[in-house]
Amino acid sequence: MASGQARPPFEEESPQPSTTVRSPEVVVDDEVPGPSAPWIDPSPQPQSLGLKRKSEWSDESEEELEEELELERAPEPEDTWVVETLCGLKMKLKRKRASSVLPEHHEAFNRLLGDPVVQKFLAWDKDLRVSDKYLLAMVIAYFSRAGLFSWQYQRIHFFLALYLASDMEEDNQAPKQDIFSFLYGKNYSQRPLFHKLRYQLLCSMRWRTWVSPEEMEEIQAYDPEHWVWARDRTLIS
């Protein structure tokens, strides 16, 4: 950066999104049948993942990117201690985890559920191999950790987060390949760009891909009647 001073990677100076790195647009070609119909148009430049970086960003090594992101990250919310029981002069404290998941992250998730390509993907994944309720809850958790404004999350972020969740939770590599099969079919040319954007998202999350069972429950408890929580893989015979 020209000034030599590190800035938080997701702090925007204006309501306009950054145009440094634009995520590819996923569109549906209705004339092509089968699950490979959606594809990512290679012509437009990918939209920003929220990283305000110089134009030479893509030429930096992964180590340099990690070091710069480490300097630019905003402080994480700190855990607090609350009184659990009080008996006479004795007091028992319980550590309360500071959750980074906000209502706006649920709103961004719900907005993307209305996207026609996302809806088609969820309907296509009949066996819930890559979109059961736990993996979808992890998408919300990842949205909270990436640090973007809710309006910045686009269709590609949903698939990037779902890929990371599957990579974290599934031993089988096949479910992740299902995402590629749906988005690109047999076209392999777009996969390197997908992995580049995946790496950017992973860095913005500080590599925190594990989501605790408590956080899973908290995310689902925000709207327990939401239809996505009925996507339970264990109930499929």
From Swiss-Prot:
Molecular-function annotations in GO: protein kinase binding
Pfam families xrefs: Spy1
The encoding gene: SPDYE4
Family: Belongs to the Speedy/Ringo family.
PANTHER family: WBSCR19-LIKE PROTEIN
Protein name: Speedy protein E4
Tissue-by-tissue expression: Predominantly expressed in testis.
Disulfide-bond pairs as recorded: none
Disordered: annotated span: 1-61
InterPro entries: Speedy
